[in-house]
C-alpha cells in the first residue's frame, strides 16, 4: 500500500514538458523552492549554464509549483544574457501559454515584443560560435511578430506587430508576404492609427512591382484598387492628395496597357476585329489618358472605323 502511494507521489513530481492546465498552481513545493535556491546560488557564482539547468528542472519536474513561472521567466532572462534569443523567446512563450495567471505574464509578453521588434530592426542579434553576432533569421523574426499579434490580438501591439512585419518583409523584397501583413492589419484593425499607412503601402507595393518591370495588368489593377480603397476609407487624410495623384497615374497606365494590347492584336496577331474593339475602348478614355486616346483614334481612322 505504501509503495503504491509513494509511486503515485513520484508520478506527481516527475512531470514532462507537457503543459499543465493553464493557471494550475500547487500551493507549496519544497523541492521546487530548494531548486530555485540552488539556481540563484549558481547565478551568484556566474554559472549561468548551471543556473539554467536548475531552473529547467523546476519547470520540467515541478510544473505546478508557484516557482515554475518564476523559473521559466528567469531562464528566459538568462538566455537573453547569453545572447541566445531564440531560446529566450521560446521560454517566454511557454510562460504565456502555461501560466496566464502569473504576475509575470504581461512582462513576458512585453519582453517578446521588445525582442521581436528589435530583431526586425536589426538591433537584436544572435551569437554564433560564441563570438560572432549576426542578425536574426528571417523565419524567426516572422514567427515572433506573429506570436506578438496572436498572444494579445485585441491589444495595440497586434497592429504594431503586423506593421513592423510588413515593413520588414517589404525591405527584403518579399512583396506578396508584405502585402499579406499589411492587409491583415487593415482588415482586422481598421481603426488603428497604423491602418491608413498600411493601406497606402499595399498600393505602393503593387505600383512598385509594375514599375520595376513586372508590368502585369493585374499588378496595375490591384494598385488602382488599393488606392481607391485608401481614398474611400481615408478621404481626408494628410496623404489623400498624393494618393489621388498616384491613382490617376495608375489609371493612365491601365489605358496605356490597353493600347499596347490593341497594337499587339493588330500587328502581331493580325486580328483586326479584336484590335478595333481595344482601340475603341482606349479612344473613349481621353479624360484619363489623352495621348493614348489620340493614338487609338488615329489607328481607328487608318482602319476606317469610327470611334465610339
Question: Where are the regions that the model predicts?
Answer:
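Bacterial N-terminal signal peptides
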Residues: 1-10
